[in-house]
Regions:
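Sterically constrained small-residue positions within well-ordered secondary structures
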Residues: 12, 36-38, 51, 72, ...
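Bacterial N-terminal signal peptides
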Residues: 7-17
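Positively charged n-region of N-terminal signal peptides that target proteins for export
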Residues: 1-7
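Primarily the internal scaffold of c-type cytochrome electron-transfer domains
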Residues: 22-40, 88-124, 174-175, 179-182
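Sequence context surrounding c-type heme c attachment/ligation sites in exported
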Residues: 41-94, 124-182
Length: 182
């Protein structure tokens, strides 16, 4: 005879498996028409990772400084942006227009309301500092893709459980449920 606890766990497992099977198709990043066909959501300021991280070779952790010590990655403070763009005005009219938005936000003391791109369900914890410690700066690219080549950042990985587990298996780290679900 099955205990009540075992029955509940079995029901949850079967429900999760059914949901997973329903949404098991390959992830396709959305294409946003109002940003010239670029993938990903339109942000309040068109931040060019391909210029900052690619052309200018600014390391991820220069702007995302708290990622190595905090559980949440954190969006860079406007102070980080204005630190450079107080002096750097942009090389093209479109870049100058976006930098003007940064300067205006700084002057008005109103940081942009960025749209989150890489979101996990509320029941999943992804402590960035642990991943940075284990994988070094390669951890950024492994999950976020080659942002140095992205004019606009978009989600390249599914960030679904199977994708995460395969990385844990490959790197021979714990697959205990409580590592990510607590």
């Amino acid at each position: 005879m099955m205990t009540k606890t075992l029955a509940v766990w079995l029901c949850l497992a079967l429900s999760a498996a059914a949901l997973s099977a329903q949404s098991a198709g390959r992830y396709q990043a959305p294409v946003v028409s109002d940003t010239g066909g670029l993938k990903g959501p339109r942000q309040p300021i068109f931040f060019r990772h391909d210029i900052h991280a690619g052309q200018d070779q600014i390391p991820c952790m220069y702007c995302h400084a708290t990622v190595a010590v905090a559980s949440e990655p954190g969006i860079p403070a406007l102070q980080t942006c204005i630190g450079c763009h107080q002096l750097i005005g942009g090389s093209t009219p479109s870049h100058q227009g976006e930098i003007k938005k940064v300067r205006d936000a700084w002057r008005e003391r109103k940081p942009p309301e960025w749209i989150r791109i890489h979101a996990l369900p509320g029941f999943v914890r992804f402590p960035h500092q642990r991943h940075i410690k284990a994988l070094g700066t390669q951890a950024c690219t492994r999950c976020h893709g080659d942002v140095q080549k992205m004019p606009q950042v978009y989600q390249v990985s599914t960030l679904r459980m199977g994708w995460c587990v395969s990385c844990h298996v490959q790197n021979k780290v714990s697959r205990d449920c409580t590592v990510c679900h607590y």
